[in-house]
């Protein structure tokens, strides 16, 4: 039995392959092929444009796939969300689908869009949003380079943005956010009802999320004199249960803890001052709570 | 006054810029910009996806543009064809939009497509063709990589092909040709009725076509003894009027002629045998008949 | 005293340097040089074509080298195999030297090769194989691109293949396997009899194999309630002795185990279900059993 | 409050960013920008030519910066050295500023430079050195490619060298060493007197040095039968305090130690012979003693 | 006898080599060398930073060199200008050295610079300009990236600009132009007084300028019926003397003329309308009036 | 009927394709293919290692091919030389096969090679040369990087050199030249006896040599007052017959001549001084005398 999985071709492909490799699945593909081989005989992978994956998952051509919430909605795909996966982005901010106009446009809010022309790659999501806001506008499909179409070709655009820097570079001003989007491991409904496929998907989710969690975390080990242990433990984040083991023939203990990487820059100097010795930090591949 | 011209962004861009440079128009653009500068104050150029240019020409946002006949038809754009331009292709064959199925499919002809699913980037052109052939099929928009969708995702595709080699590499078989397509310089109807814009467009057509014609031609000069002139002229292609000038203080004449490059490989050995001396071939930038 | 070691120049070089770096030996070489510097004063490294290394090891110009079994045999080199090293390949399948013919050739088996012409980079190995099979054929040295020579230039080829995909792409059919080959750390016989050199080579083998073993393995740590320990241990592969340590002031134990990476995808979900907490996976650089 | 930090633009930039990432600070910068963003709201980073950083630190435009001792001296910058950082070099040798002449020059020692012309990027440091040696020579500023100016343009050069290979390739001979230089984290004097900034700088130094220390070290774990422990401990470097923990229900102990990577190649074979089992080596990200 | 010529290393090198190739001098250089070989035994070429060439020409180490007027002035080099060469620029505008401040600075004119700090690569030229304008400011040498130093590090900069786009991208405003600069072939005064060297330099100037002139010009040939000749000649630019030759046995004439390329786009359509046939345009390598 | 032609794959391929394009034959090949398509239905082209082409021409598998004289001799191929083609080299010197030893070797002449070991890619040619010189040495086949084998692996090498710079960089000294080699268009003897194939080959030779001749030549045109014509003609190289035509209604004549490019740098200044006006130089594609 095999699980048929659609993964995004193109700009996300390398990041996706790296995530799967870290999760334990090695994908290899020849340059122009769309059918990678994978070192798990229970998986069959197809590369596709992210835009199309939810449609084919919905229709059952694929058991499951990775794509953004934006494209799941645009395809009106009725699928099961198995896991939320945040990767391959340059900031921790979510990706947003926003409506933007020229800086000097007199369109100030969504209601000003009545009767205007809007270019977007996500026509249906945009139309639905406008309808819900009681706005009647002409929404046209944009094949790309959407952000340069204002103001010469259209009055406004609905476009994906992460940091807003491309919008700023094109002198655009955001007037509304249609939705926030992250990558979803999503499944076909029938496939989800198959027990073998559901367990396979749940295991996949555990491994992928374990890999992502490990990216923002590090392992920390240190040796602590017995009488400094309480001080040290007080410094460590409360919710983390450190692993403490007694050293042989000694009144020192070894303390080991998993931390978020961004805490380390404050903790290491503090631990050192509090009497910890031989602090080492080591990298992690997976973290499962 | 300015003529607003849409040129294709992407894979055709470099070839288009080279053609315009040869025609006398130097376009320069910074890497992420869509608004090249051009050394002709009467032109304003916008880079766009070729798919969208006919739509914006039709609507009058652009006065004119370069795009394929396929996309003019897909956009149902009612525009004026100013010139046919054949460039940036690896063979002299026209580009074709064909319907293809898996080699081992039992779909043999268009009529077998009834009730089938077809993926294509050119949905309307394909639907129109099927309708005209009395076929009722489901045509879905493909965001790319169309040729790998058969047979897993769809039964057939309608895709652009030049040499057929990508179809062959994907084990596909052509069952019908929907249309042949070349690049067209096409104009908005109102712009065409403006005398200044029409003359500007006609001049542009002369220069672009003069540049393309020069690519397949070379200049040939040779010195010929007076008594061999008739023999030499008999060898040269009949329709070409060579330029003959008498040399000073000599009974030799200089013969100069413009030829198609592919004739040269047979003519040069023949001319040499017939008594021509000092044959030189030189490159051309434009040829206007 | 120094050990003189030949390493393969060219396509294997980067992978070899990475393996040595992981094993603890940093090699640096300027772009056109063949004499890398190495951070071990007891080693002297020469880069060479893999084809030539066994010959120079055999002759004692080098104490030892890395090359494939195929080239050791082709050079008829009488050397000591110190270690088998599997690296720098895209699949876990061994590399094979096979005899292949055109798909539509009427050569079906080795005996059909009588009187035929065969191109190969490994002339002697091929001749020996044919002789042992009672076949009399003309074997010619091929400087490269061997797989395109059938059927225009020769009747069959003897060529190296890993996945068979290049053979398939050239419409070739395998009719026999001459040998399977892996990379060997091999030594000159006299050098091997020198105690200092032998120990240096054995240590090198331990480190290189420890590095390779680590590539397919990961470290796994988890915290386990005392009463779940037996369940957890039952899930872990039997032959692996996990390291179990008691946590201070707690009835939990820490379990640590080294596993093959390909087992992890099944074990992690199972361990979690069985009550393990805070499972972390971390990367390894060397594993010595 | 923010600490304003100058980092070197150019050839050192990537290595610097990698070091900071390992230390826990992620810097991202768009291709032509000089103001990277950093995931620490207490830091403000500016990219600059290494030559200029000490000047701006001295003047208080920056609180601190990274630059070589050579440029601190050339700028006559009166700054506080916070930490010595050795990174981004191909060898462990220090970088030296040397005076070099043509191989066949009759300049043999510093005193022979009297009345000669010397090209260098470090004019003041060179002038000071000559003055201290009682030599009167003409020192001119070199914009680059200093090593090819001898002998046609100048008599000698004062240039930075690491391995000496570029000097050798240009047929130059070193006659004196002006100074040895490493990268310094250095601070403005007033900033150093501010308690918040001083602590921030000290923490930064701990993390950067912890990252650098980790690059040359590895973690080693092994299981040891109780009766072999003393033998094993005798093999391990004396100054390192290994972490020893008793295994549950067993008379084995787990021994864990942090070692310099260059010791490993001798220790692993020795430990194995002495009875250690399941030796694993794992990578480290930070080591704080 | 040889002429020793300094050519700019770096960003201008490729353009300079192309210009010399077109002028008839083929320069070849191995990647890290500064001494190209040239196919003229009378030339000896040295590659150098453009900043240093005028200094070495002034001092007689070189007979002549190519560098900008800006660097000739900065070096206070007393040299002979042999030829003005405009090449390797993206626009026909001259390069300018300008003083720029932040857009929102309250420095509005040169006189506002009193007491301010200015960064520049051309310290002496800037100081001289300020002195002549009665301004007393602190001018500091900038090693690069000058345009990002305003406003954090300095109050103003003096920097080279061609299109002004880098200044605009850094939100800078030009308040004064110090000088306009083009590339000069300049000679040492003594070398210029040597008759052989002077003639060599004059010939070099003719060839380099002939090559540059040819870049903006094309050759045009056409056949014209005798009775249309006057009309055609009236269309052609007055100052150009066309070459007219009578065709054999015909009342047509061949007209040939050299034109500036930018005239061609208007002339070709006009000539065609006026009765010219077989118009061809061909490229030129040198044009000497 | 088709002529089957072998062209060199690899480093010479691009230069060969450019030469054929200039000669009028456009070759296109997909990245991994060995069978280019060509716009001449009478040609069938195969790409091969240059080393193997003469063997397959000799055996009649190919009608003709391009390869060096060195490989024709090494293959002991009995073929017809159709044309000598000098292209794709960085200098006008011929390529030479030389015997080289270490600079400090005491091998001074060929006779000192008795009993020595020599590595070379051209074993037979080298053996024949040694035999003819009465020397008995061991010649071994080198798979590449031959020049670094001296002195550690062999006593001498026989290697191809063009400028000698690689030999110099490896501290080698040339003691003998075995042969000089250029690229030959060579034909199978039977193919040459076929009249159609012989004419096709002769035409090909005319076009290829015409293209090569054009690379070193330019066209020069100028206008000359009638009374200066003799002076001008006296300056032009004697053997070249210039084309002189009388200008209409004028006492000026137009002079046109084909020159070697290396003459132009002296002639243009001289012609200008002698009264020529409007001198233009234009590029050539073919020159057939």
Swiss-Prot record, chains A, B, C, D, E, F:
Record-given protein name: ATP phosphoribosyltransferase
Keywords of the record: Amino-acid biosynthesis, ATP-binding, Cytoplasm, Glycosyltransferase, Histidine biosynthesis, Magnesium, Metal-binding, Nucleotide-binding, Transferase
Biological function: Catalyzes the condensation of ATP and 5-phosphoribose 1-diphosphate to form N'-(5'-phosphoribosyl)-ATP (PR-ATP). Has a crucial role in the pathway because the rate of histidine biosynthesis seems to be controlled primarily by regulation of HisG enzymatic activity.
Catalysed reaction, written as an equation: 1-(5-phospho-beta-D-ribosyl)-ATP + diphosphate = 5-phospho-alpha-D-ribose 1-diphosphate + ATP
Family per similarity comment: Belongs to the ATP phosphoribosyltransferase family. Long subfamily.
HAMAP family: HisG_Long
Functional pathway: Amino-acid biosynthesis; L-histidine biosynthesis; L-histidine from 5-phospho-alpha-D-ribose 1-diphosphate: step 1/9
Classification of source organism: Bacteria, Bacillati, Bacillota, Clostridia, Eubacteriales
Superkingdom: Bacteria
UniProt xrefs under InterPro entries: ATP-PRT_HisG_long (IPR020621), ATP_PRibTrfase_cat (IPR013820), ATP_PRibTrfase_HisG (IPR001348), HisG_C (IPR013115), N-reg_PII-like_a/b (IPR011322), N-reg_PII/ATP_PRibTrfase_C (IPR015867)
Gene giving rise to this polypeptide: hisG
Activity regulation note: Feedback inhibited by histidine.
Gene Ontology BP, a term: L-histidine biosynthetic process
Record Pfam families: HisG, HisG_C
PANTHER family: ATP PHOSPHORIBOSYLTRANSFERASE, ATP PHOSPHORIBOSYLTRANSFERASE ATP-PRTASE
EC code: 2.4.2.17
